[in-house]
């Protein structure tokens, strides 16, 4: 190819191109050598290896520390809890799981106190962990919050840091243990009036009412117990009973029939508290609450029977329910309880209240007396479980029944037994027993046949009481 250059100029250009090629090759070589040297230097690999090492080191250190603290038998000093806060805030999921579980175990075993948790600033990190996407972390932190909520100071801290809403969210969780721990925490937050008001304001009542229908018996118990605590304050009743179509009362009546004894017992307690409201009572009677109640009163479980008889005595205080209770055969159930060998002072005392209430209506007096309730009351007087207070309660009931003129004649077969107890009460040094015995005698003497059965020992004891009273009167005059 003819370039028009002479041989000399063409050679000069050729030499220049060769020099440039040599320079380029040397530059590339030098560049490769530089990059290789840079990549082999530890200063450029430091951040990556450090980050990897940091995560592994944190996890290993956390596990070692937490495993060691779990084996410590004595309560931990607050200084040993300082690492927990840092570990709770870790971005490593395994560290969060291990830390929250360890803290839950320490709280459960009373190795750390709620005050220590507050002091070390761990309440807020725990509440943040409630909002984790990991169910294990949610379970563990929920258990921690539930245990903390048993303390007054911790309850206030949980509320002030916005812990109610996360707990209500977790109470709707599909994970059974997450839900269980959240409802447990809500229950403990109802243990003080102040925190309870905040719960109700944040919408806890509908959530707790819905949880009564849970398939988890512990969730049922926690939610029912929380509702019982809330029901202790009548100002919350409108919200509780305002859930449509008597939802709460129906759910509680269903829970009364639970095979889990403590759940049925708690349902009776909650209904008893709510039944102080006349409107609630009308709804309960309309829902035939007396039918399941009859079975529970005869339960072989003493706590359940006591809870049921407490509910019955509360229902009987309202005039609207008395006839219905008699019509469903409640007096027969009471008779069986009195004549049975399984009873307690609580059962007897509430039976007495029920008998007095049912007999206050004229049409029920004969029903009460013609049943074997009177025989049962007399039998209860000599029961081994009968305390002094119970004896006084039974005697008051007998005195009440005797005050009805038209039923005194029904007592005639029992005069001898009644007189024995009147004599015992007259010999008692407590004035209240003596006064009750004298009042009962006054009512019995309305029947002319009663004077025939009065014993000489009874008359002598009356004279002694009169003499004691006279001496007391004379001494008082000298003051």
Language model features with spans:
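Intrinsically disordered, low-complexity regulatory regions
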Residues: 1-86, 91-92, 100-104, 430-431, ...
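Alpha-helical solenoid repeats of the armadillo/HEAT superfamily
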Residues: 91-105, 133-149, 160-161, 173-191, ...
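Residue-level signal for cytosolic alpha-helical hairpin/rod architecture
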Residues: 81-82, 100, 111, 123, ...
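C-terminal per-repeat helix/turn "cap" of leucine-rich repeat
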Residues: 116, 122, 129, 157, ...
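Buried hydrophobic core positions in alpha-solenoid tandem helical repeats
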Residues: 83-85, 125-127, 166-168, 186, ...
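Internal amphipathic alpha-helical repeat/solenoid segments
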Residues: 75-98, 106-136
């Amino acid at each position: 190819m003819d370039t028009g250059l002479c041989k000399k100029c063409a050679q000069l250009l050729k030499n220049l191109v060769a020099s440039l090629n040599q320079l380029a090759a040397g530059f590339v070589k030098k560049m490769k050598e530089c990059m290789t040297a840079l990549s082999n230097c530890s200063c450029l690999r430091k951040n990556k290896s450090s980050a990897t090492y940091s995560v592994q080191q944190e996890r290993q250190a956390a596990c070692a520390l937490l495993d060691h603290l779990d084996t410590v038998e004595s309560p931990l000093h607050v200084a040993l809890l300082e690492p927990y806060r840092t570990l709770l805030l870790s971005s490593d999921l395994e560290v969060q799981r291990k830390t929250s579980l360890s803290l839950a175990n320490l709280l459960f075993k009373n190795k750390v106190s709620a005050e220590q948790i507050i002091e070390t600033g761990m309440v807020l990190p725990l509440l943040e962990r409630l909002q984790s996407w990991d169910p294990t972390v949610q379970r563990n932190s929920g258990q921690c919050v539930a245990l903390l909520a048993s303390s007054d100071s911790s309850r206030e801290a949980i509320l002030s840091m916005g812990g109610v809403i996360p707990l209500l969210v977790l109470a709707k969780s599909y994970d059974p243990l997450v839900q269980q721990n959240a409802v447990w925490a809500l229950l403990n937050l109802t243990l003080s009036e102040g925190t309870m008001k905040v719960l109700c304001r944040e919408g806890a009542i509908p959530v707790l009412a819905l949880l009564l229908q849970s398939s988890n018996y512990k969730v049922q118990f926690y939610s029912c117990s929380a509702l019982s605590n809330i029901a202790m304050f009548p100002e919350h009743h409108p919200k509780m009973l305002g859930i449509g179509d008597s939802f709460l009362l129906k759910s509680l009546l269903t829970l009364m029939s639970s095979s889990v004894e403590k759940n049925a017992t708690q349902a009776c307690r909650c209904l008893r508290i709510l039944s102080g409201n006349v409107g609630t009572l009308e709804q309960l009677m309309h829902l035939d609450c007396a039918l399941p109640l009859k079975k529970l009163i005869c339960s072989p479980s003493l706590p359940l029977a006591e809870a049921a008889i407490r509910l019955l005595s509360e229902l009987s205080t309202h005039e609207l329910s008395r006839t219905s209770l008699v019509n469903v055969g409640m007096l027969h159930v009471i008779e069986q309880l009195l004549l049975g060998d399984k009873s307690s002072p609580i059962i007897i005392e509430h039976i007495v209240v029920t008998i007095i209430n049912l007999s206050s209506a004229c049409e029920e007096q004969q029903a009460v007396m013609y049943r074997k309730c009177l025989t049962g009351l007399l039998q209860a007087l000599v029961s081994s479980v009968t305390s002094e207070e119970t004896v006084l309660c039974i005697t008051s009931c007998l005195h009440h029944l005797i005050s009805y003129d038209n039923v005194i004649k029904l007592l005639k077969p029992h005069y001898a037994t009644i007189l024995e107890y009147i004599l015992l009460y007259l010999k008692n040094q407590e004035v209240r027993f003596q006064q009750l015995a004298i009042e009962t005698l006054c009512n019995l003497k309305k029947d002319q046949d009663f004077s025939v059965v009065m014993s000489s020992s009874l008359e002598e004891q009356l004279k002694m009481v009169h003499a004691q009273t006279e001496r007391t009167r004379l001494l008082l005059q000298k003051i």
